[in-house]
Every structure is written in structure tokens, then in C-alpha cells.
Amino acid sequence: MTNPQGPPNDPSPWARPGDQGPLARPPASSEASTGRLRPGEPAGHIQEPVSPPTQPEQQPQTEHLAASHAHTRRSGRQAAHQAWDPTGLLAAQEEEPAAVKTKRRARRDPLTVFLVLIIVFSLVLAGLIGGELYARHVANSKVAQAVACVVKDQATASFGVAPLLLWQVATRHFTNISVETAGNQIRDAKGMQIKLTIQNVRLKNTPNSRGTIGALDATITWSSEGIKESVQNAIPILGAFVTSSVVTHPADGTVELKGLLNNITAKPIVAGKGLELQIINFNTLGFSLPKETVQSTLNEFTSSLTKNYPLGIHADSVQVTSTGVVSRFSTRDAAIPTGIQNPCFSHI
């Protein structure tokens, strides 16, 4: 049985979308929702879907927001991927400068820290030692210069080992100072040497003093040869004839001055604040020389040598030895004169 031929231009019923047979795909939900049947209309008639009115003014904003959200999501995914990418972390660590790695390792290395502390301690100790040596050099020079100015001879000074001189300079309190002269002379007394021990010095500038000295003890040694030269200088014309040699007698504490024409025996004694050579025996050969004249000359000479020391220094005792005369001087709680009162102390 054959199908009747339709008009040549009539499309085949198999090509119609609306009549696809029982095996055709059912219409989509959107199509079913938009096409509704109305009463009075034929069953094959499907109403065209009515599109909602467009709002052109909101479409650009919606598209912009959608594009912004899409860009944000892509950026977030890329950032998360980069943040959790172990390969990127390894690459960043490999690119870290070697100096920074070495510095971090040095901070964590106990040996390096210990060596740094040792170096710092050594530098501080070296600076302290250098400052101590410099302070001692300056202080020794000033004290020696003052003593040399008083005794008219070269002098050397030294401060005690403890406490540190830097601390003594800071507190202006000096505990122990030792001074020794060269032994050439003290003023005009030839062959005389002095050794000083100075304690408890406190420097404090006042109109009348530079400070105080708690205690000063001096040991003065006068050699036999020095006594001879000193007496010869004290008697300008007859000195060489009066004293050609000096012999000491420790047993009786006398000094014998032998000359070409005389023989004088004198005893060193403490007189006032200094020393004197008191004539015990005086013998002349061939000429007459008054004993009083010789005694007066010796007194003036020894007075100029051993009296009127600064700081109130005075003689305490004297002793005759086999090599000369040893005397001891001292002072307590003495005021240090200013540079105006005594130029020898101007640098203290």
C-alpha cells in the first residue's frame, strides 16, 4: 500500500519537528513550561512563548559583576596554587642569597657565638689595659716632675698595682705612690738620694690647696763621698784643705772630716725640721781657725739642704752607717700647695 503523493513542495511528514512519532525525544522542560493550551484552541496549536520584557539598563552592570567575580575566582585559584605550590617554595629557597643563609647558620652556631664573645672580651680587655698603661704613664710623669723640681735631681714615680689607676683617677683618691731620685743630689747636697712613700692622696681643688696627703715617709741617704763634696762646696776657699776625706764611725754615730791641716769630728743630729753636723772635736795643724766659725758655716749649709721642705716635711731621725748617713723624714695630713704657692706643684 502506497502513500498518496502530496504536492511537490509539501515537505515530508518525517521532516516535521512537531510530529516525530513515539520514539522522538520529549520536549524540554522549558519548552513545556512556555507552551500552554488555552480553551477553544486546537490541540495541535502551541502558543509561542512570551519573552519577558528586557531591562537593557541592568544588563551591562550584571555582565560587569559576573566578569569581576570570574576574575576574582581565577585570581584566588592562582594565588592558592602559588601559595601551596611546593615547587615554588623550593625555588624561592634556592634563590635565597648565600650570605643570608650563612648569617642564619652563624646565629645558630654555638661555637660562632662563643668566638664572638671571646673577641669582644679581648677587645674590651685590650682597651682597658691600654687605658691603664696610658694613665700610669701620665700620672708617673707628673709626680716625678714635681719631686724632681723640689730636689733638683732626676726622679721616677710609680703607683701601686691595686686598685686600678683608672679607678683612682676617677675617684681622685690615690692609695700608694712610690718615688725615688737618681742619687746625684738633693738641692746642693751632693751624693744624697731620697726614697718617698706617699699614701692616701685626695685631690680636691680649693683656693688654698690642690688636695691633701694622708702620709708621706722619706728615707734620705747621704754617702760619705757626698758629704765630702758638700762640705768642700760650703767652705769655698779652705774647703779642700779642711775636708779631703770623710770617715764614718757607726759605733758612736760620728763622722770624721780629715783635711791637710785639720781634723774635724762631727755628729749628725736632728735640729728643728732638718739636720745639722754638730762639731764634737776640732783640731788644727799650723794655723788657728775658730771652731765657732766652722760650726756656723756647717749649720748654714746643712740648714739649706735639709730644712724648709714643702708639705711640712721634717726630719725624724738620723743614723750613721758604714757608707754614710741615713735619715728619715715624714709628714702627715699635709695640704698640697697650689701652683701659685709652689710652681713645682703646678702640674699636679
From Swiss-Prot:
It is a multi-pass membrane protein. Its main location: membrane. It is found in: Cell membrane. Residues 1-11 have a biased composition (Pro residues). Keywords: Cell membrane, Membrane, Transmembrane, Transmembrane helix. Residues 1-83 are annotated as: Disordered. The keyword Cell membrane applies. One of its GO terms (cellular component) is plasma membrane. Pfam families: LmeA (PF11209). The chain crosses the membrane at residues 111-131, 235-255. InterPro entries: DUF2993. The keyword Transmembrane helix applies. Was identified as a high-confidence drug target. This is Uncharacterized protein Rv0479c. It comes from Mycobacterium tuberculosis (strain ATCC 25618 / H37Rv). The lineage of its organism: Bacteria, Bacillati, Actinomycetota, Actinomycetes, Mycobacteriales.
